[in-house]
């Protein structure tokens, strides 16, 4: 049987290259944050001058860069812990999310009038310092759009669902809208793919909504498109 292609993986945390790691797990989903777990050997980390008692303070909130044979993933460390068992010197466990996690603000309320989807999403990503490629199929300006008791990322997720736009993280950028066309990549089950599922799904009916703007005594109506773009 054919074997999955092996890629050289390198790792950097808070600007420090890690010589090795015990375990690395990266879970990627469309429309969601990506999640990772890294287990490091304490002795290997100490070689690079990392002070173990201060590792939590020094690493939490810092950038984590993974290089999978030229494919880059950039994330943020959100938890660092020390694990010891069986009398061993122990391991350091680092968990975190894609840089999109910076959009997890407090639940807030905001509104926009006569702004496009691009304007709204770019405003939020720029404010959070998240690199984004914003190119929605919906180009027209929206009469009225509001964010109500949602995090910034939750609001962007809702906009993607409401207007049936792509939303995913490509390892370095949050992509909102139709991705740029690229070259065709051939994937073979048993080589590049270890699991393959094929299915069909019935979608909900288009979303309709309306809101009243008391300042100018106007009612605004909106509807999601009937068909997904892309």
Where does each model-flagged region fall?
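Amphipathic alpha-helical and helix-coil boundary elements used as assembly
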Residues: 1-230
């Amino acid at each position: 049987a054919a074997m999955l292609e092996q890629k050289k993986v390198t790792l950097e945390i808070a600007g420090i290259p890690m010589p090795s790691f015990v375990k690395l797990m990266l879970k990627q989903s469309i429309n969601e944050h990506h999640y990772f777990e890294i287990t490091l050997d304490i002795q290997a980390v100490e070689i690079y001058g990392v002070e173990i008692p201060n590792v939590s303070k020094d690493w939490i909130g810092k950038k984590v860069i993974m290089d999978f044979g030229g494919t880059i993933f950039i994330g943020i460390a959100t938890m660092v812990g020390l694990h010891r068992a069986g009398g061993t010197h122990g391991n350091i466990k680092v968990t975190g999310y894609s840089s999109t996690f910076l959009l997890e603000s407090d639940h807030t309320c905001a509104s926009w009038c006569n702004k496009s989807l691009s304007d709204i999403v770019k405003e939020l990503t720029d404010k959070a310092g998240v690199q984004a490629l914003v190119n929605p199929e919906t180009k027209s300006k929206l009469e009225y759009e509001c964010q109500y008791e949602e995090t910034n990322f939750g609001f962007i997720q809702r906009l993607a669902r409401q207007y049936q736009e792509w939303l995913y993280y490509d390892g370095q950028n949050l992509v909102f809208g139709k991705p740029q066309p690229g070259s065709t990549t051939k994937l073979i089950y048993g080589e590049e793919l270890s699991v393959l599922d094929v299915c069909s799904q019935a979608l909900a009916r288009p979303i309709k909504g309306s809101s009243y703007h008391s300042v100018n005594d106007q009612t605004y109506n909106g509807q999601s498109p009937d068909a997904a773009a892309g």
